[in-house]
Amino acid sequence: LHQPKLLLETCSLSGQRLTAGSDYELELQLKNKHTTRKICNLKVTLASEENSLLPETSSAYFPEISPGGTATVKTKLHISESAQQKSTPLELQFEYEDDKGTACTGSEKTLLQVSQPVGIQMEGFQLADTLYSLDTVSGTVRVLNTGKAPLYNVQVQLQVPGLFPRESVFAGTLEAGQTGEGSMNIYVGTRDMKAVGESSQGSDEEKYGLVEGKLVLTYEDAYGETYTQEQ
C-alpha cells in the first residue's frame, strides 16, 4: 500500500508583496492526496532558512485528515525588518502516521515575495537670495537612499517660476545607503516668462520679486513602481 501523501494546496500570501517589518495573516491549506487512506497525528512545523519569515506559531497539530481531506494552518506571520528584498522560501515540515501507525515524514516549500520599504532624502540645494535676470547660476543637490533596497532612475527637477534649468539632476541607480550628487545650470528669466527666449511684456512688478518653487524627486523601486517626492 502506498502511504498517504500530504501536499500544500494554497498559501494565502502567495503573489503578494510583503513589506519588511510588517505583520500578515497567513493561511496554508494542506491536502491528503490519498483517496482511501487517512493521515493521523499530523504535526506541521514552519521555518525560514534566514529567519526573515517569523510565524507567531511555528507548529500546528491535527489528529487526522480524511482521505482527500484538507487541513488549514492559520497564524500571524511577521516579516523581519532586516529581511532581504527577494523571493524567500517558507518551509513546512510534516510528521504524521498512516492509518496503520507507520511513521511518515514530508516537506513542502512556498516562495513569498519580500520587499523593503523605500526611503530617500534630498539635501544641499541652495541658491543665492537674490538672482539677476539673464544670469545663469548653478545649484547642486544630493540624494541619499536611506532604505535597504536599490532605487532606480533617480532624478531631480527644479520647478520655480522664472527659473529655467538647462538639465535635471539624474542620479540613476542608487544602492542601499548610497548617495548621488549632481548640479544643474539654471537660466534666470523673469517671473512672468513661460520659456527661455520669450520676451516679457509685463510691468516690473510682474517681472521681478519673490518667487517660490520646489524640487521634484522621482524614482522607481525594483518592481517598476514610480514614486514622486517634493521639497
Task: Annotate the PLM regions.
Residues 47-56, 99-101, 152, 160-169:
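Short aromatic-acidic-glycine turn motif
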Residues 1, 81-113, 188-231:
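Terminal connector regions
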